[in-house]
Each structure stands twice: as structure tokens, then as C-alpha cells.
Amino acid sequence: MKKIFLAFLLITAMMTFAQQDNFEISKSLSIYNNVFRELNMNYVDEIDASELNTVAIDAMLDQLDPYTVFIKESEIEDYRMMTTGEYGGIGAIIRLEGDYVHISEPYEGFPAHKAGLIAGDKILSINGIDTKGKNTQEVSELLKGQAGTTLEIVVSRYGEKNPITKTLTREKVKIDNIPYYGVFDNNIGYIALGQFTKNAATELKTAFIEMKQQTDLKGLVIDLRGNGGGLLKEAVDIVNIFVPKDKLVVYTKGKNVQQNSQHRTEFEPVDTEIPLVILVNGGSASASEIVAGSIQDFDRGVILGQRTFGKGLVQNILQMSYNTQIKVTVAKYYIPSNRCIQEIDYSKNKKKTTDSIAADTLGQRFTTANGRVVYEGHGIKPDVEVKIDQMSILTIMLYNKDMFAKFADKFFYEHKKIASADKFAIDDKLYQEFIDFVKEQGFTYTNESERILSELKKTVKREGNETMLSDEIDLMEKELANAKADDFNKSRKDIVEMLRMEIVSRYYFQKGKIVTSFTDDEELHEAFNVILDTERYNEILGRNK
């Protein structure tokens, strides 16, 4: 009798909470409807009801997390492209420079490339529409369209006096999941995985098998740096290439039990023994973290680089009225050690900022298959951490002001061909040419020391100490000017790397940029060291116990 009574109390309590929730929802909707109606009837100026409604919805969703968003009808195609990696267009990356959008990088083999458009081309008009003052999103919408349709584009080009007119036929553009793969001289394979759209796992599997057939691979490096994620199924299937069938890779848990699911490996693996290193950094998120975290939890490979982003949330896209959608966070995902890698608890952290306290002191401890300790939350901590020096202010400002791109445009006009991507180098003469070019462009920048000194001068003046400290401040300004004159020497390594990639991309496109980046890639070289040192590799994975 007591059990029946307790059950009755529990059911009654649940019904009461449900009724309260329903009342609050009805109340809120009624208030919103009344406010909207009164604004429409009484506000002094005409209001755009659709725009006002979108702003209200966005403000509401902003209280939750960055991934729960309202998708307007005009944005649906962009979200479809994020899933499939396909869109109808000309196949080019664009960038804003001044008042005009420029071609930043045409995709090799697609309409922009086939029509002869090159990096640096300034887009003047599209189908007769002047593009001056338009942003990249607006220009992108003009360039995109159904495959098979044509467009006329007018561009100006460095070194050409007159505008150039091109007629292009749009195609279905497929952004490569794998922009590059290949085998190095040390017989270590490398696969750069840029995203997890449809068929990513199949493409990676095909590339891996092809390399295995070409040579006796000593190991494999999968590069997930900067990969923000994508389809969960593709992540699971990629793990499946390296671990046995029927292994639990990830499971999800949400408020509604319908969102709870388990995702296991379904096929026989390709190779469960080859030494494996996964490269990650702060831009590796979501599906990338499922792959890296699962490989780490299974002790199947070594994770190398910097701590990952920490996105352990699952979203579903739900259909709404009037051809709109809402992408909703419905669950958290957990990897084989049972840890969740989510960095921020958005229910408690409305500012959506990370905590500065050391991550390992906060997260719950879990263990891998071999008993290694790993921690929950805060992304995936690499087994081998490689610290990357922060890029200098000078290099950042040169990039932000398009100095690398502008010089590359000039260089491409003056040089019809260069050495192969892996052999092209920036020598002293070319580096000085770049410095001279930058000065001719009137480039200026303020470094951190100058900014602090400027603030100090304001404070000294405000406090009436200007006369007393003027000599000291003048001396500091002279010393800083002398030090700044040497900035191009101090930042040479970063500048050379950026400049080389920009120039190489004009001749060898995206693959060339990747190949030329290998020269200075400390993480890749450390990955080679780990793979080639069998004892170290096994020790990292806890296999020597």
C-alpha cells in the first residue's frame, strides 16, 4: 500500500510540474503576442514584422548556447552545404579587401579556375550588378545558383589596364573532405581531413588503402587541425577503419530519452596495428574530438598537438513552418571512457566563456583501455603536447591589411612559373622585396609596447606629471622606435611562412599550400618522431607496463 501511495505522489508531482511548464509557456506566448500586436498597431514608425520576429527569436536562443539557432528560409541552402559539402556555384574562396570582394583562391578544376579567374581578381560586377560596397555574403549569394546556369562576371586584375569579362557556367561544387594525402620519403602516410561531410569516411578509407598498396607504410598521420566537425556517422566510420567491429565509439544522452543513442563500429577494420598519430589543435571540434577522443580511449593511436575546442553537444535540425528550421542542442555525447568533452556548461555560464583554471584540476578522472588517466570536459588533451609560438603582431597586421595577398598578386604577374611547392623558398632578396613593397604601400601598425606607452602618456598627462617625466618618455619612444625597426627580422620566420603559402597558392592552389606548409610544420615532424620511435610510441600508449 505504501509503494502505491508513493507512486501516486510521484505521478502527481510530475503532472504538477508539467502543468506549471505548460502554463509558463502559454503565458509567455500570450505576452509576446500582445507586445507584437501593440507594437505593430501603435509604434510611431512602420516596423518590419519579419525582421523584428527574427531578432526576437535570435535573442531568445542566444540565452542557451551558440549552436541552437533559427535558420531562415534564405539560409537553408548554406546549412545543407555544411552537411553535404556541395553547392551550386563557381568554386572559389572570396575575401573582402577595401570596397570590393576579391577572388582569394579558385578551386582547381571548377568554373572559376576553368574560366581563367585567378587569386587577386577584384570582382567589379556580377550579371550587371555593381559589387562595390557589398560584403562577402552578398557577393557569395550572387555567385551561387543552380548548376547549369550562367553568369557574367567582370573583374580587374593586377597589371591589366582594362576590366576583364568572363562568362561562367555554374556547377555542383563539392568541397573536398580530404584536400591532400600522400606518403613521405620516410614511408609515413599523411591524410589532411578538412571536414566531416557526407562520404568523409569512405574517402579517408580509400586514400589509406591506396597508400598501403603503394608502399610498406610505417605509420599514418591524420591531420584534424582546424577541422570544426560535421556528421557524427562519418566520425564513427573513420574510427572503424582502425578499431575492431562492434566497439562503442560514442553515445548520446539528452533530456528526452528519444535522443539517447549508441554508435558502434559496424564493419571489419582496415588496419588495427599500424602506428597512428592524430594531429589536433584548438580548432579541432565536435566530430574531430569524437575521432581523437575515441582513438585515445582505445589506446589505438597517439594524439599530438594542442588541446581541442571542447564541443560535446549534439544538434538536430527540426522543420518549422514557412520553410524555416531550428537547429537545437538535444544531447551531449560521451566517448568510450564514458567522459564528456564539453568545455562550457552553458546552463551555468551565460557569458559563454571558458574558465581560466587548469582543466585537469576540474574534470572528473577516467581511464583508457590501457589504464591511462584522462579527464572529462575541456576537450581532448593531447598525449604529446607541442606548444606553438604565438604569431607576432607584425605578422597579424600584415595579414589583416592584405599585404601578403597583394604582394603575391604582383609576384604572380611578374613570374609565370616557380619551383615546385615543396622546393619553393623565400630567399633574402625576395624577402627584402616584400619589405620594400610593404613600405611603398604605406603600411603602418602599432605594436603592444607602443600601445602601452601611449596609455602611459595619457595617464601621466592626466595626473599632471607630464613635465617631470617627459625626458624619460621621450627616451622610451626612441628605444621603442629602434626596436620596432628590427621587427621584420624578429618576425621573419612567421612572415616567410605566410608569404610562401600565399605565393605558392597562386600556382598550385590548395594542395600546394598544404605541401609548402610541411617545411615549417613542427607538429608533423614530431609526429614522425613518435611513429619512428617504437619504444616511445608504445610507452605513450601504456603498452610497456
Language model regions located:
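Conserved functional hotspot residues or short segments at active or partner-binding sites
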Residues: C340-I341, D345-S347, K351-K545
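Structural motif
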Residues: G120-K122
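Extended, small/polar residue-biased N-terminal targeting/export presequences
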Residues: Y43-S104, G148-R170, I175-Y180, F518-F528, ...
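Short linear motifs in exposed loops
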Residues: E105, K134, T167, T329, ...
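Cleft-lining beta-strand/loop regions that shape enzyme active-site pockets
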Residues: A18-S28, Y32-A49, K72, H102-P106, ...
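Residue-level recognition of conserved beta-strand edge/terminus positions
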Residues: I126-N127, G377
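Bacterial Sec-dependent N-terminal signal peptides
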Residues: M1-F23
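Polar, glycine-rich mid-to-C-terminal structural blocks
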Residues: A287, D299, Q306, G310-R372, ...
